[in-house]
UniProtKB/Swiss-Prot annotation:
Similarity remark: Belongs to the heat shock protein 70 family.
NCBIfam families referenced in this protein's UniProt entry, alphabetically: PRK00290.1, PRK05183.1, prok_dnaK
Keywords on record: ATP-binding, Chaperone, Nucleotide-binding, Phosphoprotein, Stress response
Factors inducing expression: By stress conditions e.g. heat shock.
Entry superkingdom: Bacteria
Name this protein carries in UniProt: Chaperone protein DnaK
Stored InterPro entries: ATPase_NBD, Chaperone_DnaK, Heat_shock_70_CS, HSP70_C_sf, HSP70_peptide-bd_sf, Hsp_70_fam
Xref: Gene3D superfamilies: 1.20.1270.10, 3.30.420.40, Actin, Chain A, domain 4, Substrate Binding Domain Of DNAk, Chain A, domain 1
Chain spans, region Disordered: 597-639
Keyword NAD assigned: no
SUPFAM superfamilies per the UniProt record, alphabetical: Actin-like ATPase domain, Heat shock protein 70kD (HSP70), C-terminal subdomain, Heat shock protein 70kD (HSP70), peptide-binding domain
Amino acid sequence: MSKVIGIDLGTTNSCVAVMDGKDVRVIENAEGARTTPSQVAFTESGERLVGQPAKRQAVTNPENTLFAIKRLIGRRYSDPTVEKDKGLVPYRIVKGDNGDAWVQTRDEKYAPSQLSAFILQKMKETAEAHLGEPVTQAVITVPAYFNDSQRQATKDAGKIAGLEVLRIINEPTAAALAYGMDKKNTGTIAVFDLGGGTFDVSVLEIGDGVFEVKSTNGDTFLGGEDFDARIIDYLASEFKKEQGIDLRTDRLALQRLKEAAEKAKIELSSSMQTEVNLPFITADQAGPKHLNIKLTRAKLEALVDDLVQRTVEPCRKALADAGIKASEIDEVILVGGMTRMPKVQQVVKDFFGREPHKGVNPDEVVAMGAAIQGGVLKGDVKDVLLLDVTPLSLGIETLGGVFTRLIDRNTTIPTRKSQTFSTAEDSQTAVTIRVFQGEREMAADNKMLGQFDLVGLPSAPRGVPQIEVTFDIDANGIVNVSAKDKATGKEQAIRIQASGGLSDNDIERMVKEAELNAEADRKRKEAVEARNHADGLIHATEKNLKEYGDKIPAEDKAKVEGDLTALKAVLDSEDAESIKAKTDALMQSAMKLGEAAYSAGQSAEGAPHAAGAEASAQSRTDDGVVDADFEEVDEKKGH
C-alpha cells in the first residue's frame, strides 16, 4: 500500500514528510536540503526550474522567477492585497480570464494553482525518490485563516500535480499534532505561526489523543515577505539619498536587494549588526555604483515594529473566542521561520506572559503534522482525533444587503446547518442565493464565495414561500450549499466555486499539461545524463588517441575519429537516444585504443604486474566501485 505524504506548501519554502513506522521523517530533496524554495522559473530556452535551481538564477532572470505565489492563490485580481503585491514583486501579475489574479511570464499566463502544482510535483518527486515507489495521495496544509476559495484553489493545485488530496489541514493544527503526538500531558496550547507570507494563531486543547481547536485567527497577508519589503525599501531609500538613483525602478537591482534583505534579516536574528554589500548594483555616466549599508538589529526592529505588533490583535481575538485568558495557556508553540526573530519572540512572551516553547523545528513541524494526519486517515496512526474549526463565519445576503450568518466562525467541522428564509416580493418565482464568508455586518464587505438560483417557485405573496438553505462544511473546510423549496421539494445545490476559481475543464487541461511537462522533464534529464556520459567518453578517447593513436591500424584510428566527430555533432541536442547510439558506437570503435593502452601498460610494467593492471582497469569501469588489494591471513597464526 502506497504511503500518504504530508506537504507544507509554504509561501517561501515547502517541506514534505512521511510516516516511517511510528516516527515521522522529513524527506531531503535532490539538492540535499530538507526544505525547498517555493519558487518556479522559466528560462529563455523554455526550461522550467523549480525550487533551489529557480532561486539560484533569480538575480539574472527576475521577471520570470515567480515566488510568494501562495499570496495570490484563490484571490480576485481586484483584491486590494493583490494591488499591494504588484508593487512588491518583479514579475507581472495580470487578470486571468476568470477574473482571478494570474501571473504572466514570457508568453504564457499561469494560474497560481498551476504554479503551486509545479512545487507540489517537486515535493511528490522528492518523496518518490526517497521511498522508491509512486506516491498518489497527500495531506496538504494551508493557513488556518484561508477562506474557501483559497482552500479550493490549493486542492486544485494538488489535483493538477497528480495527487489525490485526502485532506486539507490547517497549519497550526498540523504543528500542534506534531508537537503533541508523543506527549502524554494534557493542556491548552497556543500555536503562533508567522511564516513567509501568512500569520495564524490557534488555541487548542490536547488530551488523550484528542486535538480540539477552540479558536483560530490570523492575517493571510502578513509574513516574512513584508519584513523583507521594509528592508528593501530602507536600503533603496538610503542609496537614493547617497547616489540620487532609485533602485526600485530597476528589476535586476530589486532582485539583488531582495536576496540581500532576506540574508540580512536572517543574520540579525543571531547578531546585532550586519553589512549589506552589493558591488556594481547600478551605474551612471560617472561609472559603476556600489551599495554598502550597515544595518543594526535595533534599526530592523524599528522598521518592522508595526508588522510585529499586527500579530497581537489576532492573538487577543483567538483567546476571546476560546473564552480563556493568556495566563491559562500552558504552552506557546512557535511555528514559521519568522518566529526566529528575537523581537517576535519578545512580543509573544509579553503577550502570553511566558517563554515560548522552541523545541520544534519551525520550518518542518507543519509537514510532520500533515504526515501524521495522513497516517491517521490511512489507519496507520491510532487513537488520534483531530477536531478543527472553520476560521470565518458563513452566511447569505438577505434583504437590504445584510449578512445573515448560518455558521459562526470557530465552529467545529465537519458541520451542517439549515435555516428557513422566504421571498422579499409578491409573486416571486425565483430567488438568488448569494453566499459570503467573513465577519462584517454587510454582505458586500465580506468575501463572496459564489451564488446560485432557485427557480420554479409557485407564485405567492411575499413571506409565504418557505426556502430552506443548508450549509455543509466538510473536514477540509470546503463549503457545499443547497436551497430547497419546502412546498414543491425543488432543490438546487452547489459546491461553492468562487466566481473566479478554476473550472473542471481548466483543471483537466492543466493536469494534461503537467503530465506532458513531466514527460518533457524526464526526457531532458535523460539527455543531460547521456550528455554527461558522452562528455566523459569524448575526453577519455581524445586523450587515448593522442597517446596510443599510432599504435592501432590506420583504418581503426579513422573509425574512432569518425565516431568521435559524430558524437560531438549530437552532443548539444536534446535527443537522448541519438546521443546514446553515437556513444555506443564510439565505445565499440574505441575498444582498439583500450587494447593498445592495455598492451602498452603491460610491456611497461612487465608481465608479473599484468594481473594488477587488469584489476585496476576493472575497478575503474564498474560504476565507480573500487576493488581493494587484500592479503589473506592465516587465523591460526598469532592466536
